Amino acid sequence: MGLYHSIYGTEKFQGFTLSVERRAEIRTLIGERAERLSYLNCAVLRASIERNLDSDKGPFAIDDRICGEVVELSREDFDDLLRVHLCDWLEQVPRSQEWTYRRDAYRRMAEWLGGVALESFEQVYAGH
């Protein structure tokens, strides 16, 4: 996924973006699964992630801000979306200095994923 995680723009980032009409081109470049996760990261209404964190049994679903629909996800896709979304934010927050922006939600995502995700959250937010 790498550089493509926000290729279509996100709820918060609307800088350089490609139109979703070019999804097929992106799929050809990075593969179907990576493109789907990139799209989901771009399309998700961030608040819709949190309602899934109350039960690890599912079903898992997010609100798609681009098409206006609810998208159901497998546990694997939900976890991978969380990884991408959390890593993206943890990379941005030191530059943006938005330490309070959805902090509790990002902590819950890190706790859900555990391991390196939680360690990274704690390291990035240490002292803030």
Predicted regions: what is each one?
Residues 1-109:
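Divalent metal-dependent catalytic cores for phosphoryl transfer on phosphate-bearing substrates
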Residues 109-128:
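Charged phosphate-binding loop/patch that engages nucleotide di/tri-phosphates or the phosphate backbone
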